[in-house]
Amino acid sequence: MSLIFDALQRSETERSGTKLPALSAATEVLRLAELHAAAERQSAAQPVSETAQSVDHDKIVAVEELPARAAIRVDGSNVGPINGTGKQQAAFPHFESLKCTIPPENRLVCLSQENTLAAEKFRFLGVTLKGLQRERQLKRVLITSTIPQEGKSMVATNLACTLGRTTQQKILLVEGDVRRPSLSDLFGAEKVAGLCECLLGERDLRKSVYHLVEPGIWFLPAGAVPKNPLELLQSATLSAMMNQLSSWFDWIIIDSPPVMPLADTSILARLADGILMVVRQGVTEKRHLERGLEAIDAKKLIGSVLNGSRRRTAADYYYAEPPS
């Protein structure tokens, strides 16, 4: 996390022309998530300070800029298609396909620019998450940011598509930003009913999830923007819905609203196993990041994505140089 704070400080220095004081190490709360996970694997008698010695604190992926509700309704068959192991996938229903016409100007690098550094960064992020999944309960991953325009939706979409193309697992992308839904536009897909209609009891859950064939994932869109989004998300139906979805899918990637100034994210975060914070160099201010981190359960923070990074590594030059 220290690298992200360093990057933000450099950006603010460039904008203001003055050198800002460095942040205290106490602000690096993302480290607590890894410390907590490591501590659970150690003996209760072992001091936390010893455990900290074996933890890699800077797992950062730099991505180039780029009233009461009705009970949840689920119907249909409990027998699904054949999975990658040749065995029948139990309790996985058939979902309607939704046609995508992905615009050429899209930023879905994992689909249209697979050989670029940005796409490789998302593959690295996927590998990292799969490694964490072997160590702890990690199926529902919430992607958020501190403020709008930091790239959280693009990160969520690219991550879901990357997992869908690199694994035999079933990946669901949930559009949790019900106030400002945008994912259908990213995929060039028709705007259809989804999460909100299901929470209102107007639509069956199985008919609210769609299969996006080309990306190889499933998609639960936000649906029509509700009049009372916060009340809708607070419904107990949402928890029941997430439990049902978890029984069907191997990964659930949730595109959440920004942490500030809405309460929506705190509701969705309670249902997530892990949280990824997206930070955009040149846009995010350190004070906003500090406040955003304070609003999230540190035990669920599994890492961060630095978007629009200008920091170059040896791998960057490998992808930048044309083959000789």
Spans of model-derived segments:
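P-loop NTP-binding module
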Residues: 2-324
